[in-house]
Amino acid sequence: MNKPIAIFDAGLGSYTIVEAIKKTYPQQDIIYFADRKSFPYGAKTIEELKTIIEKSVDFLLEKGASFIVLASNAPSITVLDKIKNKNKVIGIYPPLKNVLNDRRKNTLIIGAKVMIESSELQDYIKREVGDYCKQFHVENASPLIQLIESGDFINNTEETEKTIRNFIDNGENKFGKLDSITLSSTHLPWISSYFKKIIPEVKLYDPADNLVKAIKNYTNIGEGKIHSIISESEKYTAKEFLKILDILKIKLDYEII
């Protein structure tokens, strides 16, 4: 592999980033690290996340990564600026300036619990949009993320649609009629088709779009290979993760650690 870019998070979410980068830079070599041993990021404390991310970055640099994509909104917002070797890493963030540029007026930022409840997210919103911060609301989307990790969004479409519909209804009951949603967990684009069906008038923002543009200067011409590494624990095994990938018709060249 020629100067591979590593892409990682705790599981399925980061594969959407692998696909987005591969589509734009087809000759880029990629190391895809699904850190199931640390799943779920969204339920960790900030200190736990910092330790996990630092260890993962060190591991991927040892594996030969020339640059690293932290493909998870929660640690990007809460801990990325606090870790060593942060100059070798780019994170993924809610694209709030894009929302403002499109003149949207009532936006829901949805993502993992640890990010949604963090002061770091509120600081980020204020930095990005200033006085417009009052038109941005936040909501814990952990129940939706679980639908993806379990594979239920494929195996049980009726229940998935019901869960998402209830989630949207609850959000609009709290914050009024929405005109935009940022899918601020890399898992959530897997269920964007459900959102489009239920609320077709609401614009969805995928943070991956900005990330793909941002890494352009770090890409290289290689062979277009993807090497996958899957960590596992007793609770979250590689075997179960591979079953979900199989349902999604994703085939990997992988090693298990």
Question: Which ranges hold each PLM region?
Answer:
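Non-catalytic structural scaffold of enzyme domains
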Residues: 1-257
